[in-house]
Amino acid sequence: MPRRPKPAARWLLALTWPTGIALTSWDYMWRTTVMHRRETIEPAETGHLPPDHPDEVDDTEIQLPRDGVGPLFHRRYSTRIRGSELSAPELMGRLKADLNQAAPTKFARFQRVFGEGSRLGIGDEYVVRMPGPWDGPVRVVADDACSFRLATLSGHLEAGQIEFRALPADGGVVFEIESWARSGDRLSNLLYHHVRMAKEVQLHMWTSFLERVTALSGGRMTGGITIDTRRVEGPFGARA
């Protein structure tokens, strides 16, 4: 099971950041997809915390928002796909068979480190491998025909959850990625909330994921990508 690195190891990992940032920045500068971005500040956590995971899910090492640092960011990335050759359940089934079909594998790849079978299932664990210090261990905590949800584990830069869903829509499919997370520690909070570097890396990763999901569907993206961010200041309870 993954463990949280010691603080000294986290700072040593920072020495590898330039390589990771260079790779992501090159792609980021040449994006042509239309982005609709909105960020607002919410006064309370009501409606902005992740769903509870089922009782049967092992909660060992799961990082809850109360375990994090700084504000909670509730983000939703969404796009509409026209002319999809796959229904919403079919598209999600295809994705669950291999998450790397949609991952921007130039700089991010899902590696399953625990679990069996030909497709994603509850209890499976992955590490999202990225250049620099961005590797993130996660566990599947929810799974149905049109969605799945991941919770961050000890050692991840964030404390929270992220859900991927495909929704049937008139004439196509709407694909959404919704996350509820705080920074995992003070260093992560500095990079995400204050310097905003990690925040832009994250945005580039998930918008690239949506582009590749669209290609996987055989359809075309219409209206670009909408990114809605709600910043919630808390309180969130005591750290574990």
Question: What do the PLM-derived regions correspond to, one by one?
Answer:
Residues 2-129, 236-239:
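Hydrophobic ligand-binding cavity/cleft-lining segments
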Residues 129-170:
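Hydrophobic-ligand binding "helix-grip"
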Residues 155-200:
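Beta-strand/loop substructures that line and gate deep hydrophobic ligand-binding cavities in soluble
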Residues 187-233:
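A conserved amphipathic terminal alpha-helix motif
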